[in-house]
Amino acid sequence: MTVLRHAVVGLAFAAGVMGSAPAHADSEFPFGLEMTLEVRPQPGSKRIPRLEIGDNGEAQLDLWCKAGKGQFSVANNTVIFVPGAMQDSGCTPERAQADDALVNALVEAATWTRQGDFVSFVGATTLRFRVNTN
């Protein structure tokens, strides 16, 4: 009877610990998620850069004006981003320059961190994205 009681208490404790785990761990890279850059829209636009990372690291970028694809490779907190071809949809020089700077910052990022719904790519410039939860 004592063994049975200990087993029930142990199972109840394990269920409580497992039940309190978050839906995503802070240490998980955001594969399969869409994120939005934490910035204000540029003057005259409502568009904010968005990044969607597939389950295998393939990425779709929708920036201030340009759109394109890329590939993320991740090992622990190290990240490598390789951009693909970008499509220019009649960008103003200012928006094209902002898009190029954003892609370059992703390329230069060496590490990444995640705190809740925020993912940061850290290099010479830190880019902070919010995971879209809706």
Language-model segments: residues:
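Lipid interaction determinants
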Residues: 2-11, 16-134
